[in-house]
A protein has these predicted regions:
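Thiamine diphosphate
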Residues: 4-6, 32-119
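Generic structural hydrophobic/aromatic packing signal, biased to beta-strands
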Residues: 10, 19-21, 83
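Acidic-glycine-rich active-site phosphate/pyrophosphate-binding loop
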Residues: 17-36
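Active-site pocket-lining segments that scaffold enzyme catalytic pockets across diverse folds
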Residues: 1-16
Length: 119
């Protein structure tokens, strides 16, 4: 499934939650599908979507979903340790792995080779 199709399928299920969306193209896609007050577009913050989502989840009782790309996660691996340490029940990090840094020219990430973020 392509990222756009995934975002389009998810949006109807995320009406009551806060959604933090990754830099660049994913934010543009989410905006074009459905711009809502509960959507936060992280333009110019590559690698920080998960950190921003975590911070937001620690300040509200609402569910927070962060949509992050594999390239951004790889740029800020420390956020995964912080998320695991704090472990807020109202936070979901959804990593969309397309094997590339899509917003900077589609250079391949290590997930396109031997690295798996799922394991």
């Amino acid at each position: 499934m392509r990222r756009y199709e995934l975002i389009k399928a998810l949006i109807p299920e995320l009406q009551e939650v806060l959604v933090v969306c990754n830099i660049g193209i994913p934010s543009q896609e989410m905006f074009s599908i459905s711009d809502r007050e509960n959507h936060f577009y992280m333009l110019g913050s590559m690698g920080l979507c998960s950190s921003i989502g975590l911070g937001l989840s620690l300040t509200t009782k609402k569910t927070v979903v962060a949509l992050e790309g594999d390239g951004s996660v790889l740029m800020n691996l420390g956020s995964l340790a912080t998320i695991a340490n704090r472990a807020p029940r109202n936070f979901v990090l959804l990593v969309i792995d397309n094997g590339s840094y899509g917003s900077t020219g589609d250079q391949p990430t290590f997930t396109s080779e031997a690295t798996s973020l799922a394991e």
